[in-house]
Amino acid sequence: MTAAQRYEQLWRELVACDELGFDFGFTVEHHFNPNESWMPSPAIYCTGAAGRTRKMRHGPMGFVVPLYDPVRIAEDAAVLDNVLNGRLELGLVSGIVPDFFGPYRADFKNRRDLANEALVFVKKAFSTEGPLSFEGPFHQYQNVTLSVKPVQKPHPPLWMQSRDADTLAILAQEGVHTGYLFLVPRHEVAPRYREYLTRWNRAGHSTKPNIGYWVLIYVDETDDKAVAKARAYFTHCFTKVFGTRADGGIGYLRLAENFTKRGDPGGAEIAKNAVNLDYLLERNLAFVGSPKTVTAKIKAAAAEGLFNTVLGEFNIGDIAEEDLMRSIRLFGTEVLPELRSFEPY
């Protein structure tokens, strides 16, 4: 499949999801892996999605902050919220893949502090009338006037995926939604998100916090059909899509190495075994099965891991479009209605 063909398929996915009542369409920002990173510009994704959907909310999950000047993020976000007519969800991330940073001459060491600074700047930029001045640890501005302001006031909903306790404390205080990946053991991080929820409520925000959970999903008519189809797609995903990188490293094994370096043996163990579908299914780390089974899996995982937003990856590996669209349709018609009334917190 060429990049152009993949984009056309993506638009067909989004149209189907919009018609079925999906809430969000997010994109990650990845770079420099021809097998996988075909959407290096979240802003372009949002622009394309805006003209093809009517109800879904879209956004980056998120802009890799150290690769940008914060003013650029604020300007892009303001324009996108207008293009989307108030449907932007603005995600910011610090970035975890060192490969992205070198060609951009970006600061990997201070990435977390840069992301936190950008969060403060964006909120101030969108709430300031007239010229803006800002004094941050990395960026300083005097008399900057944004020519476009977002439709949503005071700003679009903000997201920052994190499992760091100190960062989560900041996000709860600032009213920023969060989330994490299936590679992170749910039972290990649940206490941190419980504290995040407590702090959010204590801060008195008028909205409810969203905690997202990124996970691979395949739904078919029966469990046996789903597992049989998913096995090949998952294998291709983790050996080809997240497979050999430019430096010769194997994607999922390098993820395991990164988790180990950060002192996270639980994440390293999941990453090392991600290529094994049986391992994932036994631990409920992939939602594969009939609509009834997938519904039960999601509810159990959400109760354990304290998430209320499923960031589902349906386009897995080299999945056939017929299977992809069937999975999306079954999820939208039979799983989604069952989840509407389910509240894990």
Language-model features, listed with the residues they occupy:
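Flexible, glycine-rich active-site loops centered on histidine and acidic residues
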Residues: 1-5, 66-134, 178, 184-186, ...
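N-terminal beta1-alpha1-beta2 module of alpha/beta enzyme domains
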Residues: 1-52, 56-57, 153-156
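Active-site mouth loops of central-metabolism enzymes
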Residues: 1-7, 63-71, 152-162, 218-220, ...
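Acidic (Asp/Glu)-rich catalytic clusters
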Residues: 18-19, 46-54, 77, 81-87, ...
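Glycine-rich, proline-tolerant flexible connector loops at the mouths of alpha/beta enzymes
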Residues: 24-48, 64, 96, 184-186, ...
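Hydrophobic faces of well-ordered beta-strands that scaffold small-molecule active sites
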Residues: 25-27, 58-60, 88-92, 158-161, ...
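Conserved, mostly hydrophobic/aromatic
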Residues: 29, 49, 80, 122, ...
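An alpha-helical appendage that flanks or caps ligand/catalytic pockets
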Residues: 109-147, 187-307, 340-345
